[in-house]
Amino acid sequence: MNPNQKIITIGSVSLTIATICFLMQIAILVTTVTLHFKQYECDSPANNQVMPCEPIIIERNITEIVYLTNTTIEKEICPKLVEYRNWSKPQCKITGFAPFSKDNSIRLSAGGDIWVTREPYVSCDPGKCYQFALGQGTTLDNKHSNDTIHDRTPHRTLLMNELGVPFHLGTRQVCIAWSSSSCHDGKAWLHVCVTGYDKNATASFIYDGRLVDSIGSWSQNILRTQESECVCINGTCTVVMTDGSASGRADTKILFIEEGKIVHTSPLSGSAQHVEECSCYPRYPGVRCICRDNWKGSNRPVVDINVKDYSIDSSYVCSGLVGDTPRKNDRSSSSYCRNPNNEKGTHGVKGWAFDDGNDVWMGRTISEDSRSGYETFKVIGGWSTPNSKLQINRQVIVDSNDRSGYSGIFSVEGKSCINRCFYVELIRGREQETRVWWTSNSIVVFCGTSGTYGTGSWPDGADINLMPI
């Protein structure tokens, strides 16, 4: 090969390499531009149209780093849409309950600014659990805490914090309320907030931080709601509300709410005689509630809600080991599934239970007459067999010589099943502890477990002699 041929060959090879490099740079440029614009668009599987990502509610942003010939390209993948919760998974099989959370609010109030509260509850969005309570518009170490034993004042507000975070001064006040319920439909929070005069109260429905709807008192006698979480299935949330006598016939309605708007109202039907302060849980495809009969029964009413056709049925828990306080002793108490037992039916306390096949798990105060101690157990046949009394898997949550209070249920969706959890209100102060002028609470929370567990007692634990008066 002569010199001219060598020059031509080298030139041809160089030109070929340069052309390849040029084409590669064009490809990189096209890829970069394409990815840059595609991060703001998602393919719609329904009609193959392009939809903007920005207005869509998302669960998370995912960023992938792609390396091409020393060029770094950031590609944002469009996140999946957030869907309504449907709670269609089965209920978890459990052997009992394990400790989950305790906020120690009263003990912390001895040396810090903590809200005075009562009527606490717990509810979870798809990723995190929150604790709620009705604040009294004051901290404990504050003269405004005097006489906070009263339930209904215009200063009461619904407080919301992450579970385990006491209600400190930075706590969000969600709404004005002396009775409330909250739940998350998979996209946003719904808060039902009742406030106003006893004879003409208003319930406000706040969805995604906005007031969407309201309803006024229909019986002019203390409109009130659950004091625990409501339940949403496929975008329809249900809440049980009562207006009328606390010791006689009252008017209970079940409201169906979609994104904060009341879409239907159903009257209570079935054999339940008096229904208040329901503890509700998803029982796909419907909702089931265990409530308080403050008139005739120490056995707890059951309210079954059909979300699809808005129909309602009601009855009573079959277990002869009844769940309300006050009640007869276990040898004398009874329940026959359909009607109130007419045993120490006046007064009562908010509580919970849930079905497990033919059996029932339940919690109650250990004392038959006062809000002292707390226990849980399973009653074999307690859901289906009248007056069943075979108790197993009993656990003490709070010893009998320590104070308890309201309790309620909340549900947590896992990978394969829905777990049931409960909270116990630990009331301190007046009326029983007259050294101080305030009434407030802390909480303890347990969740169902399929594992083993030990024993203990988890009272409030504050020394009343160390507390502000």
UniProtKB/Swiss-Prot annotation:
This is Neuraminidase. Homotetramer. It is a single-pass type II membrane protein. The influenza A genome consist of 8 RNA segments. Genetic variation of hemagglutinin and/or neuraminidase genes results in the emergence of new influenza strains. The mechanism of variation can be the result of point mutations or the result of genetic reassortment between segments of two different strains. One of its GO terms (biological process) is carbohydrate metabolic process. One of its GO terms (molecular function) is exo-alpha-sialidase activity. SUPFAM superfamilies: Sialidases. Residues 36-88 are annotated as: Hypervariable stalk region. Residues 11-33 are annotated as: Involved in apical transport and lipid raft association. It comes from Influenza A virus (strain A/Swine/Hong Kong/4/1976 H3N2). Residues 31-469 are virion surface. Belongs to the glycosyl hydrolase 34 family. Inhibited by the neuraminidase inhibitors zanamivir (Relenza) and oseltamivir (Tamiflu). These drugs interfere with the release of progeny virus from infected cells and are effective against all influenza strains. Resistance to neuraminidase inhibitors is quite rare. Pfam families: Neur. One of its GO terms (cellular component) is host cell plasma membrane. Substrate binds at R118, R152, E276, E277, R292, R371. Residues 1-9 are intravirion. Keywords: Calcium, Disulfide bond, Glycoprotein, Glycosidase, Host cell membrane, Host membrane, Hydrolase, Membrane, Metal-binding, Signal-anchor, Transmembrane, Transmembrane helix, Virion.
